[in-house]
Amino acid sequence: MTNPLYHKHIISINDLNRDDLESVLHVADKLKQHPNSQLLKDKVIASCFFEASTRTRLSFETAIHRLGASVVGFADGSNTSLGKKGETLADTISVLRTYADAIVIRHPQEGAARLASEFAGDIPVINAGDGANQHPSQTLLDLFTIKETQGRLDNLNIAMVGDLKYGRTVHSLAQALAKFTGNHLYFIAPKVLAMPEHILHLLEEHGVEYSQHETVDEVMSELDILYMTRVQKERLDPSEYANVKAQFILTSADLVNVKDNLKILHPLPRIDEITTDVDNTPYAYYFQQAGNGIYARQALLALVLNKNLVL
């Protein structure tokens, strides 16, 4: 039976239905047990990062190597023909499709990954983050981590805290959780950084329960997952950043009356929104979460490049 993700562009988490998500998580679990497979031997993956990245780029490249493939690309778009000579993204992708079997792209402009897919032909494009829009591979590792720690993706109380306006990770995660049942999402942010209306409307269309708050204290005791985010200085004007950067800081003292199964996640990098004393609590799981990025991205690459994947 042909794998439905074969040669599929992964631009938005909404490109994947629940069955697709569960397939990726199943393969990720198998690869976590046996990470050094050769599922992509002799394949070449283009890693094109037009925007700064540490974890996403390095975990993708680690995933590529562990699958037996080779990686070509760049970590600084300003040193490419697009950055130096004014080449269009369309032309860049039209050339890269002749070099590689798949293209992983991060770009500061919303919609850039979708545009790239339109010029890639049958070469799958994986969005590694486009502006404040989507970050589907981060969402897959988030879902994998939630399932790993909670044993399920349904009937959970999940809080997302901090920058919900510009944070592409929470946009994608909220949309993904809408594909599962019985979850309650708590959105905790200052009004200036609230979850965008189009995300709220999507949740309403799917019958997802959610509530909005300005402090985490009122819901902390109910939570299974606390998903912290940093206030993104690079996407705010200085006065706006100064007003909100210290509004949501989690310390170990905040974790007194929490559920035993609570896990704290964060897409990283952390600045000062989680103090280091939280790291040594049994609830901190953000470094393990980052490590899971390798397996989720291995699974995604293996599925889009293997017509009949059996594990």
From Swiss-Prot:
The record's similarity note reads:
Belongs to the aspartate/ornithine carbamoyltransferase superfamily. ATCase family.
Instruction: Tell me, in a sentence or two, what this protein's role is.
Output: Catalyzes the condensation of carbamoyl phosphate and aspartate to form carbamoyl aspartate and inorganic phosphate, the committed step in the de novo pyrimidine nucleotide biosynthesis pathway.
- Give the reaction(s) catalysed: carbamoyl phosphate + L-aspartate = N-carbamoyl-L-aspartate + phosphate + H(+)
Q: Name one GO cellular component term.
A: cytosol
**Species annotation:** Proteus mirabilis (strain HI4320)
Would you say which domain of life the source belongs to?
Answer: Bacteria
Q: Enzyme group, top EC level?
A: transferase
Q: What is the protein's given name?
A: Aspartate carbamoyltransferase catalytic subunit
Q: Does the keyword Zinc-finger apply?
A: no
| Annotated positions binding L-aspartate | K85, R168, R230
Could you tell me which Pfam families the record lists for this protein? OTCace, OTCace_N
Q: Which UniProt keywords apply?
A: Pyrimidine biosynthesis, Transferase
Q: What pathway is this protein said to act in by its record? A: Pyrimidine metabolism; UMP biosynthesis via de novo pathway; (S)-dihydroorotate from bicarbonate: step 2/3
Assembly and oligomerization: Heterododecamer (2C3:3R2) of six catalytic PyrB chains organized as two trimers (C3), and six regulatory PyrI chains organized as three dimers (R2).
User: Which cysteines bridge via disulfide bonds?
Assistant: none
One Gene Ontology MF term: amino acid binding
Gene Ontology process terms (BP)? 'de novo' pyrimidine nucleobase biosynthetic process; 'de novo' UMP biosynthetic process; amino acid metabolic process
* UniProt cross-references to Gene3D superfamilies, sorted A to Z: Aspartate/ornithine carbamoyltransferase
Residues bound to carbamoyl phosphate are R55, T56, R106, H135, Q138, L268, P269
Enzyme Commission number(s) from the entry: 2.1.3.2
